[in-house]
Amino acid sequence: MREILHIQGGQCGNQIGSKFWEVVCDEHGIDPTGRYVGTSDLQLERVNVYYNEASCGRFVPRAVLMDLEPGTMDSVRTGPYGQIFRPDNFVFGQSGAGNNWAKGHYTEGAELIDSVLDVVRKEAENCDCLQGFQVCHSLGGGTGSGMGTLLISKIREEYPDRMMLTFSVFPSPKVSDTVVEPYNATLSVHQLVENADECMVLDNEALYDICFRTLKLTTPSFGDLNHLISATMSGVTCCLRFPGQLNSDLRKLAVNLIPFPRLHFFMVGFAPLTSRGSQQYRALTVPELTQQMWDAKNMMCAADPRHGRYLTASAMFRGKMSTKEVDEQMINVQNKNSSYFVEWIPNNVKSSVCDIPPRGLSMASTFIGNSTSIQEMFRRVSEQFTAMFRRKAFLHWYTGEGMDEMEFTEAESNMNDLVSEYQQYQDATADEEGDYEDEEEQVPEDE
């Protein structure tokens, strides 16, 4: 019941995805061959959210893995949990997208997309009541961004009423992998605004900062970064997979977090994050978790929530704790930092509590916030985009694949509209909304 279909695309998506499956398998007590080796019945109660049970009692992830080159797939297949996936669900091309959005979206990706959709359809038919899709990808490359957004729009056509949740890794401000990242990211955001329901915005630089500052790792690897992401990913869906006092699912999350349909880009955070050495000196309490999860240093994308205001936020706690205490802490946060919340959305912090904590912790929490400060990310990408686009730099890579300059202009203006929408709601006050209502009320009296 309430299954989620997981899709990972491109190198980044596949690496995050494989880490995520390690975490989920661990939580449900499933070993790398797909056998159940857990100890608690709760692990099996709703294991079917992410797993199909095969005839021989093995659990097979509901995962579709796609890429335009075989390299990353091979490393997933040889990785610790490589044998657990259904072999038919690996869909890959040979040519690669070469960090080119147009190749992923229009040429190479378009040739492969039908075979990916067949696998998705097959998995969806195996579900009892499909809740939605979660997609892992990056927006800077070619496959995750170009083909990822193509797949999202195709799935949107075929399953219009299912939730579409994405974990999107944005290009970092200071660390750039390729020069055309701003192009790829802008073209992708253009698609995500229209076709996704909820986007969790991640960014390598912010994740590096968390590893350096909070976890005190001297040389963080991508594995460490992906581990942070997968902790958050499993936190978002823990309410579906384990019993809890206040449940939430993807749709409830959307209802509570998205006041206006286009503004669905969220910041995420996770607590407790402590360095290995200092772990034993910290008490895990609800106030302690709350304080860390609202901390700006804890956000997994390079935007500072103190520069904007929260439209809405959601806190998902895991572990044995009293709901009363959780509610008190949430009200406390809102009262103390009231200037950081818009006053025209009442009760804009939603909390949920799930009884089963992650492995090795007594309690943990996942934070998802819809903050207007996320516009910093879009602004930054947009500036880099404009700097290149007005000189038409590197455009021939895209026009050569059959794209039109018009598409770039459209994507650019869509992103700028998004930024100004966030700005508009950041500046909006309750009085303005009030005046508007008064005018409406006066109309009948004049008649």
Swiss-Prot record:
GO cellular component terms, semicolon-separated: cytoplasm; microtubule
Main location: cytoplasm
Binding positions for GTP per the UniProt entry: 11, 69, 138, 142-144, 204, 226
Subcellular location per the Swiss-Prot or TrEMBL entry: Cytoplasm, Cytoskeleton
Cofactor: Mg(2+)
Acidic residues: compositionally biased ranges: 429-447
Keywords, comma-separated and alphabetical: Cytoplasm, Cytoskeleton, GTP-binding, Magnesium, Metal-binding, Microtubule, Nucleotide-binding
Record region (Disordered): 411-447
Pfam families named in the record: Tubulin, Tubulin_C
Disulfide bonds: none
A GO BP entry: microtubule cytoskeleton organization
The keyword Hydrolase is assigned to this record: no
Membrane-traversing stretches: none
Ranges of compositional bias, category Polar residues: 411-427
Gene3D superfamilies, per the entry: Helix hairpin bin, Tubulin/FtsZ, C-terminal domain, Tubulin/FtsZ, GTPase domain
PROSITE patterns referenced in this protein's UniProt entry, alphabetically: TUBULIN, TUBULIN_B_AUTOREG
GO molecular function: GTP binding; GTPase activity; metal ion binding; structural constituent of cytoskeleton
Cited function: Tubulin is the major constituent of microtubules, a cylinder consisting of laterally associated linear protofilaments composed of alpha- and beta-tubulin heterodimers. Microtubules grow by the addition of GTP-tubulin dimers to the microtubule end, where a stabilizing cap forms. Below the cap, tubulin dimers are in GDP-bound state, owing to GTPase activity of alpha-tubulin.
Family the UniProt entry places it in: Belongs to the tubulin family.
Protein name from the UniProt record: Tubulin beta-1 chain
Source organism (scientific name): Oryza sativa subsp. japonica (Rice)
Organism lineage: Eukaryota, Viridiplantae, Streptophyta, Embryophyta, Tracheophyta
